[in-house]
């Protein structure tokens, strides 16, 4: 449990704090945090949500915490012009799931790359999966 929270929550905060001075110097800075739809509190509050039964204190709760941290970043940075967005790569084959995901890491990275490359007029404050499909917070 600690390793998952260290990666998904505390590690993200440490990188954010370390990189913020550099991001503040950029005219087109952005933060793209990688979460999961299973971290959506809105979805998990619905007993009909397919992943509702698996919501627990390790992975899903760590992603819900990451979502909250991302929201805090958005609030902190809203007057700076730094874009902050959250993406879900989907059920991607990784070491965490024993490579049992339904898609390759190349496909899982599509939304991360799309959001990272948004133009200066692109949105901030979004939570999306591939093809800009909105995920409820």
Go through the PLM ranges and name each one.
Residues 1-5, 24-78:
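Catalytic loop of short-chain dehydrogenase/reductase
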């Amino acid at each position: 449990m600690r390793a998952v929270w260290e990666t998904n929550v505390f590690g993200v905060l440490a990188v954010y704090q370390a990189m913020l001075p550099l991001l503040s110097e950029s005219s087109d800075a952005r933060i793209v945090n990688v979460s999961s739809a299973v971290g959506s509190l809105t979805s998990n509050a619905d007993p009909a949500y397919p992943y509702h039964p698996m919501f627990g204190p390790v992975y899903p709760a760590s992603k819900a915490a990451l979502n909250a941290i991302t929201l805090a970043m958005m609030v902190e940075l809203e007057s700076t012009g730094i874009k902050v967005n959250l993406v879900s790569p989907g059920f991607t084959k990784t070491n965490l799931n024993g490579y049992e995901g339904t898609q390759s890491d190349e496909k899982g990275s599509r939304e991360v790359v799309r959001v990272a490359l948004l133009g200066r007029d692109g949105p901030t404050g979004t939570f999306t999966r591939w093809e800009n499909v909105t995920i409820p917070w």
